[in-house]
Design a protein with these regions (language model features):
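Buried, small/hydrophobic-residue-enriched core segments of structured protein domains
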Residues: 49-65, 101, 110
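C-terminal-of-GTPase-core extension/linker across diverse P-loop GTPases
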Residues: 79-250
């Protein structure tokens, strides 16, 4: 997982305030959004709004994503109308999905909250909407009272993780949550010289998982020898697991 620091978001970013347009175009290139939100008080560290209010910060960020998406969707709907009027089936289908998403955005909700079936989701995918991306909230909570954290986490609008950037705590949880958010998992290869970790999409078959090592694995895959990890540990070695009949071919 690669984390990209995108700075410059302020209220009005969707209208070009601050680094608005640059910020928003950078977000379009990522697979998910990690919103790092300040929870701790420190008079020596200035807050852009001159007060620490994590829920308000989240609201501001999400609203800017929503407004940017609303403009994108509205423009697309407008551009489709000529094709819709002449009965183009593809345009009609896309227009219907866009109108559903537009309604969600107009109600100040993230596009991801729109109820879409698989076909509709595929249609909207090409729009690369900002608020359709999965979001994880990282609460930077150095030395914050527990009751403050509890209040914030009760109202936070999605998955979150607690971190402490000063003392570098919670980063392992952050990585785990990021993997979950993106639907990723890790498998390991091991040999005499090294053990390596490979990142794949959850549920990948062996041939697809093998492409993380080399693309040839997909096209030239024949079979896999499988053994449960606990059986392998109990046996003490792969050779012994094979001798005990614990290895099967799939």
């Amino acid at each position: 997982v690669e984390f990209v620091d995108i700075a410059g978001l302020i209220e009005g970013a969707s209208k070009g305030e601050g680094l608005g347009n640059k910020f928003l175009s950078n977000i379009r290139e990522v697979d998910a959004i990690l919103e790092v939100v300040r929870v701790f008080e420190d008079k020596d560290i200035i807050h852009v709004a001159n007060k620490v209010d994590p829920l308000q910060d989240i609201s501001v960020i999400n609203l800017e994503l929503i407004l940017a998406d609303l403009e994108t969707v509205s423009k697309r709907i407008s551009n489709l109308q000529k094709d819709v009027k002449r009965g183009d089936k593809v345009a009609i289908a896309e227009n219907a999905v866009l109108e559903k998403v537009e309604k969600t955005l107009s109600d100040s909700h993230l596009a991801s909250e729109t109820v879409l079936d698989e076909k509709e989701s595929e249609i909207i995918k090409s729009m690369h909407l900002l608020s359709m991306k999965p979001i994880l909230y990282a609460l930077n909570s150095s030395e914050v009272a527990e009751n403050v954290i509890e209040k914030v986490t009760k109202e936070i609008p999605g998955s979150y993780v607690l971190i402490d950037a000063i003392f570098e705590k919670g980063f392992e949880d952050l990585i785990k949550k990021s993997y979950e958010l993106l639907g990723l998992e890790t498998y390991f290869t091991t040999g005499e010289d090294e053990t390596r970790a490979w990142t794949i999409k959850k549920g990948s078959t062996a041939p697809i998982a093998g492409t993380a090592i080399h693309t040839d694995f997909k096209d030239k895959f024949i079979r896999a020898e499988v053994v449960f990890w606990k059986d392998l540990l109990d046996a003490g070695s792969y050779a012994e697991a094979r001798n005990k009949g614990l290895v099967r071919t799939e």
